[in-house]
Amino acid sequence: ALCNCNRIIIPHMCWKKCGKK
């Protein structure tokens, strides 16, 4: 699955890719 960092809710698996903690 692709990580969409533009979404308000981001899966915790995508946080690292999106730079979120």
From Swiss-Prot:
Known role: Presynaptic neurotoxin that blocks the inwardly rectifying Kir1.1/KCNJ1 and Kir3.1/3.4 (KCNJ3/KCNJ5) potassium channels with high affinity by binding to the M1-M2 linker region of these channels in a 1:1 stoichiometry. It may block the potassium channel pore by occluding its alpha helix into the channel vestibule. Tertiapin-Q also inhibits calcium-activated large conductance BK-type (KCNMA) potassium channels in a concentration-, and voltage-dependent manner, in addition to inhibiting Kir3.1/3.2 (KCNJ3/KCNJ6) heteromultimers potassium channels.
Swiss-Prot/TrEMBL site (Susceptible to oxidation) positions: M13
GO CC entries: extracellular region; host cell presynaptic membrane
Localization terms from the record: Secreted
Comment field (misc): Tertiapin-Q is a stable (non-oxidizable) and functionally similar derivative of tertiapin whose Met-13 residue is replaced with a Gln residue.
Keywords on record: Calcium-activated potassium channel impairing toxin, Calmodulin-binding, Disulfide bond, Ion channel impairing toxin, Neurotoxin, Oxidation, Potassium channel impairing toxin, Presynaptic neurotoxin, Secreted, Toxin
Source organism of the structure: Apis mellifera (Honeybee)
Free-text description of this protein's post-translational modifications in UniProt: Oxidation of Met-13 results in the loss of biological activity.
Cystine bridges: C3-C14, C5-C18
Keyword Disulfide bond appears in the UniProt entry: yes
Annotated tissue distribution: Expressed by the venom gland.
Nuclease as UniProt keyword: no
GO molecular function terms noted in the UniProt entry: calmodulin binding; potassium channel regulator activity; toxin activity
Record's protein name: Tertiapin
